Amino acid sequence: MKYTELKDKSIKELEELLHAKKAELFELHVKLKAMQLSNPNEIKKARRNIARINTAINAYYSSSVE
């Protein structure tokens, strides 16, 4: 997921996507603890995707304030 894809979405879509990605990250942590996660690098990717979504949300709010 790239930032350019995210900046075109509405705030509602971004918040729904953020909620879904946080749930996915939780599932990955559970799988890691249960030794069922085949690729631990997926946690890093999920965290970075969450950060990208948060950046897009913050950019939306900062542009609406100005």
UniProtKB/Swiss-Prot annotation:
PROSITE patterns: RIBOSOMAL_L29. One of its GO terms (molecular function) is structural constituent of ribosome. It comes from the Bacteria. SUPFAM superfamilies: Ribosomal protein L29 (L29p) (SSF46561). One of its GO terms (cellular component) is cytosolic large ribosomal subunit. CDD domains: Ribosomal_L29_HIP. InterPro entries: Ribosomal_protein_uL29, Ribosomal_uL29, Ribosomal_uL29_CS, Ribosomal_uL29_sf. Gene3D superfamilies: 1.10.287.310. The keyword Cell inner membrane does not apply. Keywords: Ribonucleoprotein, Ribosomal protein. The keyword Ribonucleoprotein applies. GO terms for biological process: translation. Belongs to the universal ribosomal protein uL29 family. HAMAP family: Ribosomal_uL29. This is Large ribosomal subunit protein uL29. The lineage of its organism: Bacteria, Pseudomonadati, Campylobacterota, Epsilonproteobacteria, Campylobacterales.
